[in-house]
Amino acid sequence: MKVLCTVLVVTLLAGCRADVEPEPEVLEPAVWKSGQPWELALGRFWDYVRWVQTLSDQVQEELLSSQVTQELTVLMEDTMKAVKAYKSELEQELVPMAEDTKARLSKELQAAQARLGADMEEVRNRLALYRNEMQAMLGQSAEELRARLASHLRKLRKRMLRDAEDLQKRLAVYKDGASEGAERGVSAIRERLGSLVEQSRVRAALTSQPLQERAQAWGKQLRGRLEEVRGQAQDRLEEVREQMEEVRVKIEEQAEAFQARLKGWFEPMVEDMRRQWADLIEKVQAAVGASTPAPTQNP
């Protein structure tokens, strides 16, 4: 619907050229197509108005609705929001600038911003007035109303271009002031840091000798302490090794004693089982031999 309404405000103004002498076409600024967000938003606003000028009589009833005014209001708000956002971005860079200069630039920029907003407001009001006149007609033909609207819009467009260019220039001054203020701030910081570095260098040169002596004394003490700790660690390590060796010997002795004890327990048992097994085999063999009949001889 927004696209349809956008097509609505640009055809009407083009159709207004029937009975009036066409005025030279004002070229669209290049920045409206590839500039700051607010410039792009302003370009969309006027593209919408130009689109309305291209509408034919068949869509006039669509133009009479309030949708066109609402669409223009949204485009106006988008443009002014983008201007405010860009201005706020520049204000962040104006911190190092003098307060009086900053206040003056801000005041001039607000005035230019207000003029541009008033221009867009007048375009919207002119379309609303045209809608009311079309409804009442007031003894005039539709072509006369369209021609008069086209003339007013061309004048408003020229004024808007002039005020937009003025706003661009003031924003550029605002930005240049921010850059200069930032550069002055950086220069002051650089000078201050240079002074501090020089003072630190002189102070370090004056105190370097005592510090070197203290560092050497601390290094000597630290080396002595490290030697002492290393000797203690070696003694402790040797002591631990001896203790581990004693533990190993005790474990081996206990293992041998346990093995001998197990052998003493199981050998008699195994010998007894072997003897019982041999007796059992002899008994089985004897029983088998007794139960086998003697072979008989045939006569």
From Swiss-Prot:
Sites where the protein binds heparin: L156, R157, K158, R159, G219, K220, Q221, L222, R223, G224, R225, L226
Annotated stretches, region: 8 X 22 AA approximate tandem repeats: 74-245
Pfam families: Apolipoprotein (PF01442)
Subcellular location: Secreted; Secreted, Extracellular space; Secreted, Extracellular space, Extracellular matrix; Extracellular vesicle
LDL and other lipoprotein receptors binding: annotated segments: 152-162
Signal peptide start and end residues: 1-18
A GO molecular-function descriptor: heparin binding
Keyword set, alphabetical order: Chylomicron, Endosome, Extracellular matrix, Glycoprotein, HDL, Heparin-binding, Lipid transport, Lipid-binding, Oxidation, Phosphoprotein, Repeat, Secreted, Signal, Transport, VLDL
Residues forming coiled coils: none
The record's account of how the chain is modified after translation: APOE exists as multiple glycosylated and sialylated glycoforms within cells and in plasma. The extent of glycosylation and sialylation are tissue and context specific.
Modified residues (Methionine sulfoxide): M137
One Gene Ontology term from the biological process aspect of the record: acylglycerol homeostasis
Region of interest (Specificity for association with VLDL), residue spans: 261-273
Transmembrane segments: none
A single Gene Ontology CC term: extracellular exosome
Domain of life: Eukaryota
Function field: APOE is an apolipoprotein, a protein associating with lipid particles, that mainly functions in lipoprotein-mediated lipid transport between organs via the plasma and interstitial fluids. APOE is a core component of plasma lipoproteins and is involved in their production, conversion and clearance. Apolipoproteins are amphipathic molecules that interact both with lipids of the lipoprotein particle core and the aqueous environment of the plasma.
Quaternary organization: Homotetramer. May interact with ABCA1; functionally associated with ABCA1 in the biogenesis of HDLs. May interact with APP/A4 amyloid-beta peptide; the interaction is extremely stable in vitro but its physiological significance is unclear. May interact with MAPT. May interact with MAP2. In the cerebrospinal fluid, interacts with secreted SORL1. Interacts with PMEL; this allows the loading of PMEL luminal fragment on ILVs to induce fibril nucleation.
Protein known as: Apolipoprotein E
